[in-house]
């Protein structure tokens, strides 16, 4: 940057590595030049709303692009601004630094400006929710436009528009307004600090939308990879926004590959077929839709096994999707995480999660097609309310997705590891006593090693 540029902008630029700074500094001229070449009309010295729309139009709605423009305009660059000149070079650089490399304290004023306006000091949860709907929609569109779908096919998946609204409402529900419905800067700072997904959405939209490519930091990963799904024949309940919501909650996060194991739409309504598809297949996500449109499910952290005892561990959870998106983790009250039984006369036969016999948080009867969610006032295991529209529900659709590696793959990975890798203290002691580590450096590298 030149000597005449603001001290504030120069400090922000220092956050980027030397090899990244040309990409950041060149963004202004590139955006300005794109508009100049696309139109023979007179252009301002700064960036205009039209310039942003030309660049981001395929990844964000018109209202979201206006919000970004408001955020840019809200920045004090530390140098005089000329009214009518548009967004200055310094404002853009500070904006990029705060979104791509900033803290919750620096991002909070930008979120406030994008939700309420450049001069705002406070906003409402309703305004934040509207902003979030625009932002989540933009994230989904950006993933599709930039080819970051990781083998998912949105056109064969659940209602994406509904999912955007549900995820936006869920994220907004995490706000802790100081007043009944009022959010100030401190409230937004706390929210951004607690909800890392917010920063990822912003980073994805601004980095990809404005074409800022940073070698040291690829675009945020918001989706897990889809390892297998019969897309030609499939129309699933799972949606991209639901994947964005669920995958960070899993033990392996976004790295866990998903594969379809069972769907009533493809495999029919058969409890025996369900067992055959899911037993001993590793961790799974169950997704249930009842005949009244409610969508809910659960995550099982271990393979399903047929036995009269409860199974699983505290990593299991229940969740709701529609009419609201929420997660319900274990309370510690009991260990009734998972249950699967068949062919017993004295024990319940079916699949359940949480609660107790006859009063599960989620229950699918072996006589396929119906179940219950008897959790009034709350499920003892997960603290979840009634998940279905009615306590006893009829099943419309059931999907089961395997998440993570298969048990045999996990076992094979563990066998590959040297005992010295598993116990670094033993390795250190051998080196201290002069023992030669003959196998060191001789094993074939792992597939995922550089």
Swiss-Prot record:
Keywords noted in UniProt: Cytoplasm, Lysosome, Membrane
PROSITE patterns per UniProt: TLDC
Annotated region described as Disordered, given as residue ranges: 430-450
Top-level lineage group: Eukaryota
GO cellular component: cytoplasm; lysosomal membrane; membrane; nucleus
Domain TLDc: 236-404
Location relative to the cell: Membrane; Cytoplasm; Lysosome
Entry-linked InterPro entries: TLDc_dom (IPR006571)
General function of this protein: Activates an alternative mTOR signaling to regulate cell proliferation and migration.
GO biological process, one term: response to oxidative stress
UniProt keyword Membrane, yes or no: yes
Name the UniProt record assigns to this protein: MTOR-associated protein MEAK7
């Amino acid at each position: 940057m030149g000597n005449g540029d603001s001290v504030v902008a120069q400090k922000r630029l220092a956050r980027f590595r030397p090899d990244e700074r040309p990409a950041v500094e060149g963004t202004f001229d590139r955006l300005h030049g794109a508009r100049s070449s696309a139109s023979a009309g007179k252009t301002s010295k700064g960036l205009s709303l039209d310039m942003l729309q030309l660049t981001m139009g395929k990844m964000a709605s018109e209202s979201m692009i206006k919000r970004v423009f408001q955020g840019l305009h809200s920045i004090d660059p530390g140098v005089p601004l000329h009214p009518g000149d548009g967004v200055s070079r310094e404002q853009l650089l500070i904006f990029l630094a705060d979104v791509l490399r900033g803290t919750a304290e620096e991002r909070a004023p930008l979120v406030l400006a994008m939700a309420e306006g450049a001069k705002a000091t406070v906003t409402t949860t309703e305004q934040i929710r509207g902003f979030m709907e625009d932002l989540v929609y933009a994230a989904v569109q950006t993933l599709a436009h930039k080819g970051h779908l990781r083998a998912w096919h949105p056109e064969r998946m659940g209602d994406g528009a509904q999912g955007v609204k549900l995820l936006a409402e869920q994220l907004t529900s995490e706000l802790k307004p100081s007043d009944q419905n009022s959010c100030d800067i401190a409230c937004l700072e706390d929210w951004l600090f607690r909800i890392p997904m917010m920063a990822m959405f912003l980073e994805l939209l601004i980095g990809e939308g404005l074409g800022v490519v940073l070698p040291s930091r690829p675009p945020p990963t918001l989706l897990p990879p889809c390892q297998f799904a019969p897309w030609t024949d499939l129309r699933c309940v799972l949606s991209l926004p639901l994947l964005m919501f669920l995958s960070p909650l899993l033990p392996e996060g976004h790295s866990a590959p998903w594969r379809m194991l069972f769907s009533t739409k493809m495999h029919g309504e058969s409890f025996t077929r369900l067992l055959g598809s899911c037993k001993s297949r590793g961790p799974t996500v169950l997704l249930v839709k009842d005949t009244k449109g409610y969508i809910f499910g659960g995550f099982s952290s271990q393979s399903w096994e047929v036995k009269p005892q409860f199974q699983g561990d505290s990593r299991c959870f229940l969740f709701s999707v529609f009419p609201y998106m929420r997660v319900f983790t274990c309370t510690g009250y009991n260990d009734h995480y998972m249950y699967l039984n068949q062919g017993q006369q004295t024990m319940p036969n079916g699949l359940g999660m949480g609660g107790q016999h006859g009063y599960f948080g989620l229950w699918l009867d072996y006589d396929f097609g119906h179940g219950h969610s008897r959790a009034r006032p709350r499920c003892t295991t997960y603290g979840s309310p009634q998940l279905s529209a009615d306590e006893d529900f009829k099943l419309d659709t059931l999907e089961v997705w395997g998440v993570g590696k298969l048990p045999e793959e996990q076992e094979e990975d563990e066998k590959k590891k040297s005992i010295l890798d598993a116990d670094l203290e033993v390795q250190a002691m051998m080196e201290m006593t002069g023992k030669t580590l003959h196998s060191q450096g001789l094993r074939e590298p792992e597939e995922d090693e550089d």
